[in-house]
Structures are given as C-alpha cells and as structure tokens.
Amino acid sequence: MSVMQFSGLLVVWLLSTLFIATLTWFEFRRVRFNFNVFFSLLFLLTFFFGFPLTSVLVFRFDVGVAPPEILLQALLSAACFYGVYYVTYKTRLRKRVVDVPRKPLFTMNRVETHLTWVILMGIALVSVAIFFMHNGFLLFRLHSYSQIFSSEVSGVALKRFFYFFIPAMLVVYFLRQDSKAWLFFLVSTVAFGLLTYMIVGGTRANIIIAFAIFLFIGIIRGWISLWMLAAAGVLGIVGMFWLALKRYGLNVSGDEAFYTFLYLTRDTFSPWENLALLLQNYHNIEFQGLAPIVRDFYVFIPTWLWPGRPSIVLNSANYFTWEVLNNHSGLAISPTLIGSLVVMGGALFIPLGAIVVGLIIKWFDWLYELGNREPNRYKAAILHSFCFGAIFNMIVLAREGLDSFVSRVVFFLVVFGASLLVAKLLFWLFDSAGLIHKRTTSLPQAQVEGKL
C-alpha cells in the first residue's frame, strides 16, 4: 500500500467515522441511551476502530492486507449500510398516538420476579457445575484454544446457558437501581465471567458483556461521565489483551508485544478486514440465501432428538472460514454482519439487511421504552433485564452476522420466557398451598400487584 493509497483510504475513513459518530452523538444528547446508540457505537467499533490498527501493522510491521481498492469497498459498504439502517430506524410508518390504556400482555409481582431471577441464575450455575464436573478447568488443561471445539471436551452445548447469569443479576439491579446494586452487578458478573473463563478455557464474552452493561447503566444514571467511559474502554482493551495472551499461551515482549497487541485488539474488537477478505473473494462465493439462518438453529437441537443432525453446521461464519479462507483449524472466523449478508445474497443483501437490522433495533427500543413507562416496577425490571440481556445478541449480530443473531435471540427468548412461565407456575402452586402472604408494610399501589 502506497502513501497515496493510504491517504485516500484515510479520507474515506475519517468522513465515514465522522458521519456515524455525529449521528450517534446527536442521539446520545437527545436520549442519553437507547439501543440505537449502543448499536451505533458497536458498529463503529466493529467496522472502523480497526483501520488505524491495520495502518500501523502495514507501515510499522509490513503486514500484508487486502488490496487498497478492496479495503475501500469495505469502508464504503459499512458507511452505506449504516446510512440505510439509520433511515430505516428513524422512519415512522404511522403517526405517534397518545398512549391509551391497554390490557397488559402479562403482569409480575414481587414473588414471581424473584423466582424468575433465581431460576435464571440456577440455569447458569447448574450448567457451569455440570460442565466443570465433565471437564475441570480447561484453561490449565488444553494446549491451544481450538481444542475447546474438539472431542476432548464434552458438554459443549452447556456453554449456551452460562450467559443467563447476567440477566438474572440485571433483574436484581433493576429492582433496586442504586449505586450499591450497580457495583454488586459488576462484581458478581465479572467474577462469574472469570470463573467461566477458567472453566471453558479462554471464553471472554461474559466478562466483556458484563463490563459493557455496567458502563452503560452508569452512563444512563449519570454515575460515570464520558471521559470515565473512555478510560474504562482503554482499561477494557488492555484487560482483553491480557486475557487473550493467557488464552493463547503467548509470552511476548518488545516489538513482538506491540505487534501482538495490535493484531489481537483488531481481531477482538474490530474484525473489519474479514469483510475485506470476503469482498476480495466475492467471485468465488456461492450465495447461500437464507439457508445459514436455518442451519444455525441446528446447534440447538440435541442429537438424541435428531439422530441424523449434521455434525458440521454451514452457517455464514463456517462458510467464510472453510470455503472462502480454506481454514480448517477448528476455529470459526467472524465474517461480520455485512460479511454474513454478502455470503447469503451478495451486495444486494447489504441494503436489505440494513433495513432488517433497523427494524430489529427499533423493536428493542420500543420494548425498552415500554419498560421505562411501566408503573409496575417488577414488570419493568423484567422488561429491562430482557433488553439489556440481549446486548450479547447484538454483539453477535455485529461480529458474527445475521444468521447467528437470529438463532441466538430466539434461544434467549425461549429460555427467558420459559423461566417466566415456570416462575408464575411456582407462584400459583405456592399461593394455592397457602404459602404466600400479603406484606404488612404498605407500599405505593403502583409497586404492588397481585399477592406479595
């Protein structure tokens, strides 16, 4: 890459970043937080944060990258995607009407709410315990991270249930919403994330997500400022780098440490070059249509229920890894959101996918606002826990693609909904047995619903 080519890419990167950052800043000033703000920051991180890191790798360490014209296509496709997404998100198909009283779809009381978070926490802890009994501390047993996906490790499906510890702790926080509950959320979820990091052998997702939710709650409540958020972001990047070194068993120093920091940070937070690799091999891609979305559900179906289930799931990430990169190391390489759309339907699917994502984020913001307006604090805690708990799925959306997001959000919805139903069933059984008594302390009517 010549200096002139880099200068052209830099101009496009600056304009695109300024465009997205400006819209995000105006939205932040208007509402302080919603899921449009979160997705916009996540989109910036995924598709634009890595450009400076790539530039240093190219000019400082002479690392090979995709041709400049392909990198330009990656930057422009990301900017155009966001433009279509933003227009979709802001477009209102019908006039806003004054809210009229409607019969609620469901209600929650104190006992049901506490039962819900206990059930969610129980799902996570029992899954961790069973996985640990089968495998022990994988971080100290395995020699490479790819071994996590080998036959040496049993009960891999249980990892999908670990995450429900976070929405459980979110319910606890939203019932109190003070600084002590906020700090308790951080300590409990990060401690659980470190435990799963050691047990699973290097999975950092629970730690990253817990820390991100903690920061956004702090921003919403005004407990942390923007400069504190930036400082926490730097601390988070350094922390994730250290955990990555431990995960891959790397011992580096000097220039090698700087080089390792650059490429690990880029791959962890901003795998934008993966999109460039897909575009570089565009002529070799056999478009998969919507099949990757259907295939991604296969991993949630146990073999005892479907004995003939394919052992290899060809979703967009695996197609990119195996068919495009010809990489069979055992790790799936993230194609990114836009990359998954390219795998499914080429360039035509990029604006269509942007419209779909705009509607998805709009729905989450509608649910979040519903929780903000809800007078029943127990129901509000459940709604907010569901919304913030889905942040993990939005990270999957940006990094892994639309197919992975759809399967995971459906799985999250099913488990969360089942926990609610079980909590209501248990409350009904306890109430029928005469074990539920009304509280003697008088509370505001808006905070009391049903028998407490």
Swiss-Prot record:
GO terms for biological process: enterobacterial common antigen biosynthetic process. The chain crosses the membrane at residues 6-26, 37-57, 63-83, 118-138, 155-175, 181-201, 207-227, 228-248, 341-361, 378-398, 410-430. Pathway: Bacterial outer membrane biogenesis; enterobacterial common antigen biosynthesis. Its main location: membrane. Keywords: Cell inner membrane, Cell membrane, Membrane, Transmembrane, Transmembrane helix. It is a multi-pass membrane protein. One of its GO terms (cellular component) is plasma membrane. It is found in: Cell inner membrane. Belongs to the WzyE family. Probably part of a complex composed of WzxE, WzyE and WzzE. Probably involved in the polymerization of enterobacterial common antigen (ECA) trisaccharide repeat units. NCBIfam families: PRK02975.1. This is Probable ECA polymerase. The lineage of its organism: Bacteria, Pseudomonadati, Pseudomonadota, Gammaproteobacteria, Enterobacterales. The gene is wzyE.
